Each structure stands twice: as structure tokens, then as C-alpha cells.
Amino acid sequence: MIRISLVIPTHNRAAQLVAALESVVRQDLPRDEWECVVVSNNSTDDTEARFAAFAAAHPGCGLRLVAEEGPGVSYARNRGLREAQAPLVAFIDDDERVNEGFLRAYLEFFETRPGAVVAGGRIVAEYPAGRPAWMSKYVEMPIANPMDFGERVRPFPAGRVPGGGNMAFRRAGLASYGGFDPTLGRVNGELIGGEENDFFERLLLGGETIWYVPGAVMWHIIPPAKLTGAYFRRLSYNVGVSQRLRAEIHRRLPKTFVLEIAKWAATLVL
């Protein structure tokens, strides 16, 4: 019986996807207890062929690929939720790798807390070319979104929510919240996001607790291309666009503007 599903959205990153899958197939759960659903979001590279070859080389791992034509990661994640066969669904992205106990950690968490609906795990930044000497935690936050809140299961700290590349849900508890907003989220390589924060905000407003599960570890792989001034300026601009879109959706633009200015001012002081 499939007890937990893992969903990986992907768009034109076949090589990175295969690297992510290499870590997925090493999960320490019995193979008949989990599945992995890759959602190819309008990929035009060799994603389908490379996935098929990888799946053929790893029979019995419950790997399958579905195509989603709706543009953007929100459409892909919503498709993954619909396709998942298990009552529990975890998400990672295609530029990551996970520990062998990733799915087990989430499975054991939800089984011991039957009222829990949402959780997120530890995120570690990984730099294949080495961590730059100039990197600070304030620059690393928007680029890699690292998270480490200790060694015990606990609610997420106030003001923090899971990263979209390491989150898990109990499907039965999501019915009243809808899915990820398709007007938010990255499309065709653009850096506009905010769909995860929007979803988590709805869950919090609904009275849910977001739990931190330290045993679900994800390494976010940061290539040299994401360590340039041009990339950081583009990312910073699109973070602002994402915040504005979310503020307009929730009709709180003035409050959001003041809060974001305060946060950026604090990072400059610190």
C-alpha cells in the first residue's frame, strides 16, 4: 500500500531532475510504501526520455511522469496533488537532493500527530563550486532559503514557513483551502514566486499549525549561475513583484510595503 507520495515539478532541467531522482530512489522505506510523481511542466528538452531511461533502470521504485500544460509551478504542484495516490504528499524541487530518511521522517511525523495537516523540513544550502567568501546569511536567504530550527519536532517559528522544495501535507486536511494560486509562482524560468507563502498563509488563517520535521533533510543545490550580481538583482526585483501580487490578492498593500521596508532596513543595519 502506498502510504506517501513525493511530487517533483520540473521544467527543462532534465539533468538536474535525474540527479534529484538519484537521491529519491535511495529512500529507506519499503518500495511498495511510496511513489514519486514527476510533473513535467511544458518541458521541451529531453526530460521525458531521460526520465524514462532512469525509471527503466530503477524498476519497482514507483516512478511515474505526468505532463501538465498549465504554465507555472503552481499548476504543476496542483496536478501533483491530484495525481498522488497516497494520503500524505511531500514536495521537492528538481534542483535538490534529499536524505535517505526523508519520506520516513514525514510519514512517522504524520502518523504520530493525526491532527497535523502541514509540515516542512530542514534545508541546507549546497554549493558545488564552493560557498563564496562574500556570502552572508542575508544574501543566502533569498537564494537558498536555508532552514535549521534544531533537532526536535516543533511548530515553525513565528514569521517562518517551509520552503516549497521541502514541504508535506495530509491531503484530507487540504480540502477547504484550495490549491496553489496559479496567478503566483514561477513560469518558464521567471523568478516570480509567492505561491507557497500564499498557501501557508491560508492554512495559518484557518487555524492550522505548521510543523518543523528535522529528519526530512533537503540540500538545495546552488550553481555558480545563481551567485552573480545580475541574478541577485533579478531575484530581488521579482521577490518584490511577488510580495506586491500577494498583497493585492489579500488587499493589504500598505501594510506589506511598510513591513518589507522594515525588514530590508534591518538587514542593512545588521
Where are these regions (language model features)?
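N-proximal low-complexity "stem/linker" segments adjacent to membrane-targeting elements
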Residues: 1-26
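A conserved acidic beta->alpha catalytic loop
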Residues: 23, 40-49, 96
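Glycine-rich, basic loop-to-helix element that forms the pyrophosphate-binding segment
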Residues: 68-84, 105
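Short aromatic/hydrophobic "clamp" motif used to bind/position activated sugar donors
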Residues: 89
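Short, flexible, basic/aromatic active-site loop/helix in glycosyltransferases
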Residues: 121, 138-160
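A short, conserved alpha-helix in the catalytic core of glycosyltransferases
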Residues: 164-178, 183-217
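Catalytic core of nucleotide-sugar-dependent glycosyltransferases
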Residues: 192, 205-209, 215-218, 228-254
